Structure formats: structure tokens, C-alpha cells
Amino acid sequence: MNDVPNLFGSMVFNDTVMQARLPKDSYKALKKAILQGAHLELDVANVVANAMKDWAVEKGATHFTHWFQPMTGITAEKHDSFISPAGDGTIIMEFSGKELVRGEPDASSFPSGGLRATFEARGYTVWDITSYAFIKDGTLCIPTAFCSYSGEALDKKTPLLRSMETLNQQALRILKLFGNTKTQRVITTVGPEQEYFLIDKQSYLKRPDLLYTGRTLFGARPPKGQELDDHYFGALKPRVSAFMKELDEELWKLGVHAKTKHNEVAPAQHELAPVFSTTNIATDHNQITMELMKSIADKHDLACLLHEKPFAGVNGSGKHNNWSLSTDDGANLLEPGETPYENAQFLLFLVAVVKAVDEYQDLLRVSVANAGNDHRLGANEAPPAIVSMFLGDELTEILEAIESGADYHNREKLQMEIGVTVLPHFFKDTTDRNRTSPFAFTGNKFEFRMVGSTFSISGPNIVLNTVVAESLALFADRLETASDFQSELAALIQETICAHKRIIFNGNNYADEWMQEAAQRGLSNLRTTVEALPAFISPKSMALFTKHHVFTDTEIHSRYEIFMESYCKTLHIEALTMVDMAKKYIIPACLSYENELAELLLRKKSCGDFDCSLEEYLLDKIASLSGYMLGKLTELELALITSKQEQETEPLARFYRDSVFARMSELRFTVDELETLVAKKHWPMPTYADMLYSAN
């Protein structure tokens, strides 16, 4: 495979294909609908559908599906064939504009947070014309939004599109104030860096916890973890390299701009990073990426683990959300330029983000909250649960100068001195990077690093788009009525810096001292999902989302219920899995080894006066720990029984966090210690050492 340009997008009904296959008037009408949000007439939809069907059939497709993203966090699809009876015992291949534009899946079988009852089954999928259709496994996949019969959004795409629209509207107001009348649309762009683990498939299949929950619920640390930092950017192992090569090719066929691949910090951990694209398209592409990672890994006798913390004791996996603002004519609104201190438009957009992150830090925390990410955030491997911003030395100095009214002296670009004459000379950047920051400015974009690896990026970007839109709306309200635009602009930037500078922190976010300082600054520290989620239904949050028409009140409350229920169900499944594994695997293994030790001890004693201290020690230690394990297992089972008595979602979630998870941790500690004592031939499942070094 060398012809990447021809391979790229070959399974996508993209703009090039549309131009070649659609009549000019139909193509123009479709492009107008895509670029300007104009209504697409049914006769045009019929033409597009027929062209799409012909193209798909030529590519080997036999079915089509409305591909949507319900509140499960993964994609959903129902496959219908193109065939239609011809009346003479034959068939024809048909696909109408109505079938393209709208579908009717069962809305009661997906999470709805009470929006849909079992008897209220009707839901609609609606074509997202801004995201290209593509062919996957012989099926034409049409990206769609998903709503209920009464119009409520039941998916992650609909509110994302709404948030992009409100940000577009408010950003255009700001640009017009600066005299820009050419820009017709402002879009948000995202490049999500996807981290994941690869282990041998046979090891995976022998671990019930990985099969049921995506993470290991038991497992002692191996002798070697990530201490030597020798896995990060290391040479790719042959099987991993073959997997990555096929993944690249399949992603390129589907128009995904897969760009960078490398080993990550933890053993068996890797990363794939794409080029930026429009946020809703980037969201679709990331869902495709995660799906293909799993299916292609399986073909290579590997298992792809996307959980935020599949292995204790080594780094977990995140998904850095690189977010920026661009115009339809190619300008990046977060590009500082050569002289950022003189770039008033950039500074206004910058402080709008600063204001948004400070005022809605709790909502940003909500957007990355789930049971899996609770294991990762604040664990000295990922940003803490405290939201702060890194701007770097240069921008921080500029903002400090504006705040104080002092003159700013531009930083000189320094040439990098390496001390080797044969190496090329280059200028160093004006600021370093801070990998511990949850929300960092990295040149011409913001990198939101708190997002978990399993997440759809729609949630974090819905919040980010909406809170920035709110800042821009307030700025526009003030500047549009100003008698002197320039003086009002200067005052607004200065006031915003003074009011929100507490959110800026360029230091070490892992340090204990930062937690104390953050508390003094008044920043929130919502350590767990259960602490964070109530902020989603606060009056302030609800007013924000309804003002910008991103969510209705009922949609907000339904999502809150879904998030809380998901947290409870996740911990419930994990706890049941631990109980099952302890009873069916761990206890029999311990008894088997105890029996072997007891028989050996009896034989040695019957043969003479031999030293039996080792056997006696092991037998006593394992028997003692086994008894203690039984006690902790019983406590966990009792906690699960008690959980059934609580009917309200929020108290139930607190019970799972405080009682069930605590019992799970105690049981795990005991089992992990037993693993270090029981002979390997008796231990019933692959260990961390077996799994983390299995994908060679």
C-alpha cells in the first residue's frame, strides 16, 4: 500500500464524489445546505440518495444504516438492505430521499433519563448533512442525529451541533465589531489524541474482569512497570506495528486524518493522534477510530483496551481534546501572531476563554466525569480534578502587563544552543509546555487534557463551546453599545483579566502545594463523579444551556439521571464481577495451593525431622489472608444487598462511592497480596506481568 492519496477517502461520499455524481443544481443546493444551514428540498434529497446508493453499490455495499450516537457513549446502527421487490420475482436496488433524510429507530430501548417510557417507542434519526456518509463492512453509514417523538435530543450529536451554532453566532458578532464582514461562519475544530492499551487476545479472554468491565479488578504490580521510561516513543513491536499499519489504512479509507502513532508511557500503552477537523466531524471520526481499534486488534490476536484505568500502578489512558476556533476563510482566531500584545482581537478571544473556564470550571469537570476517569484524574499521571489554565510565560506576562497598565516589552526569540555544530540552528519557542495542566494553551489552540479515553468528545466540546459562547455574548452586548469601541475594548480586556486571573496557573499541577493554593484561590476540587454531577443541574448551568438553546430543562435533567445511573451501574457490574471472580477463581486457587502445601508438609514431617518453616509460613499466611478475603467478600455482598434499598439516584451513587467501592478496594488489596504468594501454576488468570508484556 503506497498510493495513500488515492486510498484516502475512497470509502467516503465526500465533496469530490458529490461533484462528480450529482447534477450541478443538486450539488449547489446540497452545498448551500451544508455551508449555510439552508433547508434541503425532498427532490434534491432524492437525487442525492440515488447517487449515494449507486456509488455505494459500486463499492460493494448492500445495506444502509442511520449511524447515530445515543447516550450509551458508543454508536448505534440498524441495517436495511437496498433491495425492493420488482413484482416479477426479481428485485431492484432503491434508496429514497426520505430514507436518506429520516429514520425511525426504537427510542425506548436507549438511555433516555425518563424522556421515553417503554410504551413510548417512536424516535427519529435525522441526516447530519455536514458529516459525510461512508461505507463500513458493506453498509452505507449515514451520520445522523437522534431525537424523540416529542423533539427532545436523545443523543450526543444534536446538542453538539446546537453548541457549535451558538458559538458561531456569538463569534460572528465579535468579528463584525472588528470590521470583519467577509466571514460567514466560525467553526470549532478539534484534534483528539486517543490513548489505548494492546494486550494479547488470549490473555484478555482469560480475564473475566476485562471482558465484563474493561479494567482489571485484581492484579498485583509486576516487577517492572514504567519506572525506566523506556516504553515512551520506543521502537514498535512487530505485532503492534502491523496493527497500527492496518489501522492507519482503514482510517484513511474512511477519511480520518490519522497522523501520529507512538508508544505511550505505560507498558502496552499507545496513542493515535489525527489532524484537526470540524468538531462534529472529529467526534464522528473518533467514534470510528475507537471502533476500528477494537475490531482490527481482534484480527491481529490482540485486544484493545480503551478504559481510563485498565491496570493499577501504571498510567491510565486519556484523550487530549485540542480545541480551537477558525473562520470559514481559514483564519485561526486563537493564533497570537508575531506580536500578540498588539493583537486586540486575539486577546479578546483569549480572555473570553479564560473567563469561560473560570466561571464554569465545575461544568468542565462534569463533562469528563465517569467512574473510569475517577481512577485517573489526580493520580500524578493526569491532570488533577481541579480545573486551571496554563498560558505560558509570554501570554501570562502580556496579561499581567495589561492588568497593571504597564508597558510590555516583547520577548526576543532566542536561538537554541545545543553545543553541536553539525546540528541545524533554530529559534526556541517563547514558552515551555506544561504536561500537568488540565487546560493548556499550546500555541494556537487549547488542549483539554482531562477527557477520558472512553469518552465521546461531544460532551466536553458541548460544554466548551457553550461557555465560550456565553463569554462572547456578554462581550458583544457591551461592545455593541459602546460609544468608544477602542477604549471600551481595552477596559473590557483589563477587567476580565483582573476578575478571572485566579484560574491561570503555570506551575506543577501534581504538587500538593497546588491543592492548597487552589483552595485559597477559590477554585473547585470535585474529586469524584458523584461530587461533580450536581453542578450540571444547578440553576446557573441550566440558565446557561437554555439561554443558548443547547439543552432544554428536561434534556438537562434526563442527562443528569443517565450519568448518575451509569455511574451506579458501572460500579455494580464491577462489584458483581469481583464477587464472581473471588468465588469461582480466587478461592479455589488458594484452596488448591493450600492443599498442596499441606500435603507437602505432612510428607516432610512423616519422613523425618526436616525444617518445615517455609511450608508452615506459606500455609499460615495464605490461610490467614484467605479468611480475611472471605470476610471482605461477605462485606461486599452485604453492601450490594443494601444498595437495593435506595431508590433515589444521587443517594445511591453516594452509597456506591462510599460503601461499595470501599469494600471493593479492600477485597482487591487482599487478593493482590495473595497473588504474590500463590504459585503461578495455581493462579487462575494471567497476571499483570503476563499481560503488559504480551503484545510483542
Model features per residue range: what roles?
Residues 1-14, 33-35, 223-232:
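Gly-rich Lys/Arg/Thr-decorated short loops/hinges at beta-loop-alpha junctions or inter-strand turns
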Residues 7-120:
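Active-site core of metal-dependent hydrolases
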Residues 44-48, 68-70, 98-99, 146, ...:
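Active-site-proximal loop/turn and secondary-structure-junction residues that shape catalytic pockets
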Residues 44, 68, 96, 274, ...:
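Active-site proximal loops enriched in glycine and acidic residues that flank catalytic Cys/His/Asp
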Residues 1-27, 41, 122-142, 442, ...:
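Catalytic pocket of metal/acid-base enzymes, prominently hydrolases
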Residues 120-306, 315-318, 325-561:
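Glycine-rich, acidic/polar active-site loops that bind/position phosphate-bearing ligands
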Residues 73-89, 105-108, 113, 207, ...:
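Short linear, low-complexity motifs centered on an aromatic residue
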